[in-house]
Design a protein with these regions (language model features):
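Sec-dependent N-terminal signal peptides
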Residues: 9-19
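Predominantly soluble domains enriched in secretory-pathway, periplasmic, or organellar proteins
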Residues: 2-6, 10, 23-194
Length: 194
């Protein structure tokens, strides 16, 4: 039996065209069903709390007009704002420790991290991660990505800069446990395999 006709250019072209049409119809349906809603200026990262059935959004607001930022609690189905937590520092990166229901936000501009109780919205504490003063020669590392290890209540925070680092923070005491230095130039990504 010859299968040569199954590999003809005409059949390959038809299969490719058919695949593209099917794929584009799915993406059109997905785009039509996607819920979008304007929430605030400077939306940066989100954290999802299954226990609280909430989506938390870090917004830095306006760079020049607003001194701080706002963390919004959103209904994950409707994207309605159910709570707004005003912060004197601009929040950028976001994560949540599901075990303690503590939200963690990286304050990139201030080289700090803020811990917020997800149930009450109260600030539990703040830690400055790089206290060096910014000058022409010195560029303090900036917190970028945050990952929470719920099993150990440890927060890992990438510090972006010329000589990047990862800060390891005790989630209970909100104190620096250790720093993993020299993780590369401008290293931004962070993942936890526990």
């Amino acid at each position: 039996m010859h299968l040569r006709h199954l590999f003809s250019p005409r059949l390959r072209g038809s299969l490719l065209l058919g695949s593209l049409l099917v794929a584009s119809s799915f993406s059109t349906l997905a785009a039509e069903d996607m819920l979008r809603k304007a929430v605030g200026k400077g939306a940066y990262e989100m954290a999802w709390s299954q226990q609280e059935n909430a989506l938390w959004l870090a917004t830095s607001q306006s760079r020049k007009l607003d001194k701080g930022g706002v963390v919004y609690r959103l209904d994950p189905v409707t994207l309605e704002i159910t709570q707004a937590i005003h912060n004197d520092l601009k929040p950028f990166g976001a994560t949540i420790n599901a075990a303690t229901q503590t939200l963690w936000f990286g304050n990139t501009i201030n080289s700090a991290v803020t811990a917020i109780d997800a149930k009450t919205g109260d600030v539990k504490g703040r830690l400055v991660l790089d206290a060096r003063k910014r000058t022409e020669e010195v560029r303090p590392l900036q917190p970028r990505e945050l990952v929470a290890d719920a099993a150990t209540n440890t927060i890992y925070i990438s510090g972006v800069g010329k000589e990047s680092a990862i800060w390891v923070v005790d989630g209970e005491t909100i104190k620096l446990k250790t720093t993993i230095e020299n993780t590369g130039k401008m290293s931004t990504g962070l993942a936890l395999d526990s």
